[in-house]
A protein has these predicted regions:
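Conserved class I S-adenosyl-L-methionine
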Residues: 1-48, 61-65, 147-172
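C-terminal helical/coil "lid" or tail adjacent to the Rossmann-like core of SAM-dependent
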Residues: 6, 13, 17, 21, ...
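Class I SAM-dependent methyltransferase SAM/SAH-binding core
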Residues: 53-55, 59-107
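A short acidic, Gly/Pro-enriched loop at the edge of an enzyme's catalytic core
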Residues: 109-118
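A short SAM/SAH-binding and catalytic strip from SAM-dependent methyltransferases
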Residues: 117-130
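A short glycine-rich, Lys/Arg-flanked "PGG" loop and its adjoining helix->strand segment in the class I
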Residues: 130-142
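Short alpha-helix
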Residues: 183-199
Length: 274
């Protein structure tokens, strides 16, 4: 799964559907991350603007939440791999200073700035947490905060079990849903905590969020997994979004409805001296 492939999927498939947020997983998760920041009082009684760098900002859904709480006291910066996603963010946030690049290069942009808050949301499946952590640390002010939000490999257990039965693998050319070998997400909460600690962060708040998912049929699944961006590389690899009427009937008859859950780690960590 190359950077160019991911970028193309976000530009051509995901960007125009992202804000629809089927199943409300993105919005509900961002609400929890926003609440962590609010209760830590990062937005209260500041003498100057809070410099926020949202890495993997998408269409600006998180920055708009912060600005709804703090208004003009936010100075927003953002990075995203998709030009189309950033265009959507500019429409919502006129003061946004943005750049197009992979999150692996987050430390290469806005070199004149250090930040009070850096947010990395749903990108550790593409850029490993151990790569992100030192780069985030280097761009934060002393005592600054990192809002980390990312899936773990424990997500979608029922989907993984169903998708990897022998009949479905045969139908799709022997290919399986290989989460372990495809995404770079941390294994679990402990891996997140250990990585943050090793890189000079103290976790101030953390939550494991497991929102329930229910897909009545293939169309509902594709709205979430393919067009919504959650499993686009997997769906694209096996051509699930292109199946004909017979395969669609079979899947709706024997695979759906499907109930499952996501698994997301939501952490607010503070930079400390090494």
């Amino acid at each position: 799964m190359t950077t160019d492939t991911i970028q193309q999927q976000y530009n051509d498939v995901i960007a125009c559907h992202y804000d629809l947020d089927p199943q409300s997983v993105t919005g509900d998760t961002l609400d929890r991350a926003t609440e962590q920041i609010r209760t830590q009082q990062l937005l209260v009684d500041r003498p100057d603007k809070l410099r926020v760098y949202d890495v993997g900002m998408g269409t600006g859904m998180f920055l708009t939440r912060l600005m709804a709480l703090a208004g003009n006291s936010i100075q927003p910066f953002g990075l995203d791999l998709s030009e189309k996603m950033i265009e959507c963010a500019y429409q919502k946030i006129p003061d946004l200073v943005g750049a197009v690049d992979t999150a692996a290069n987050l430390d290469a942009h806005f070199p004149e700035q250090s930040f009070d808050l850096i947010c990395t949301h749903f990108i550790s499946g593409f850029v490993p947490l151990h790569v992100l952590a030192p780069k985030v640390w280097s761009r934060l002010e002393e005592g600054g905060y990192w809002s980390y939000l990312g899936a773990t490999k424990g997500a979608y257990p029922n989907l993984q079990a169903k998708a990897n039965n022998k009949l479905l693998q045969w139908m799709f050319g022997g290919r399986k849903l290989d989460v372990e070998g495809t995404v770079l997400s941390p294994k679990d909460r402990q891996e997140v905590l250990d990585t943050l600690d090793r890189n000079g962060f103290v976790v101030r708040q953390c939550e494991t969020f497991e929102p329930k998912l229910r897909f009545a049929n293939l169309d509902e699944f594709l709205d979430f997994a393919y067009y919504g961006g959650w499993l686009t590389p997997f769906v694209d690899a096996i051509g699930l979004h292109k199946v004909g009427p017979v395969t669609r009937w079979f899947l709706n008859r024997f695979f759906f409805p499907l109930e499952d859950h996501h698994c997301v780690e939501i952490h607010l960590a503070q930079k400390m001296s090494r």
